[in-house]
Amino acid sequence: MRNHIIFFSGGKSSFSVADYVKTNYPNDNILLYFTDTLWEDEDLYRFIFEASDKLELPMLIHSRGITPAQLMVQQRFMANNRVGTCSKELKMKVSSQYLKKGIVPEVEKWHNKHYLKDSNFVSDATLYFGIGFEEMHREGPIRANWKPFKIEMPLIENIIDNNAVLAKHNIRQPRMYDMQFAHNNCKGRCVKAGQGHFKNLLMKDEKTFIELMEQEIVISEYIRYCKQPAIKSGKQPDYMYKDVWEFVSTGKKSNKILNILEGSNYLKSKWRNLGVDNKGQPIKKPYTFMKTLSLEDLEKQPIQCDIWDIGGCGCFVEYEED
């Protein structure tokens, strides 16, 4: 009996891969493996639990116990569409340390564990990814990152209709696809996304867009604040951390947070001194998820953007072990 581990993202492609493995290796030890950023759409959880139930496969859920926004505050770094630290820390590092070193993260949950046929499911396991031919640029890095494991990507080598697989099991697709998102990640808040993606978020889920926009403003100002010599050296206490952490965790807006949000136009004005960066160079503009445009700017002029700039996480590509 062989071991098969499916990286189960909550998307249609990874579900098709799970069905493929179950169909071709019904008597083997198969595991659905989900790394949770705690930032996902509520309907994603409905989908992964229903998938586990109908496929009759065990699902292991691992998490660091923090969201991408909380990670940015901890690291004092704005994850963005050039550097996806949230994907690296909350997904890639979690899974790599567990499967290669046996390190269990802060949060571990099981669903349908009784379907697990052997508790030793990691040894000589084949790892499966829901990567299709349109994402073949991810194939090489994933294979390199996961040596010495054997890697399989059935959607590259086989013609599989995701919607037909959903119909086969009578499972409704995640609602993010109904909202015309290209993937079902992070409730449309993926920081590696582009203008077209965030424009769609603004039109389809304005509440989530506004929450993310405000987090971008506050985290940017907090990072700038932390780069000041007195704070960075520890000579002066960090008077903002508690308020910023509570804001990104619960949405509560203290007076400090309200001052940042209400003064956002001044905070990014050309005549304001934003401080210096790690190299001692002047910080010329606020930190943003996208390179050239803040979400606040996008909200004000949503039509004047590149609608074809979709972007996305590309998990398990940019990762080197510590």
What are these regions (language model features)?
Residues 1-322:
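Nucleotide-activated chemistry modules centered on ATP-dependent adenylation/adenylyltransferase
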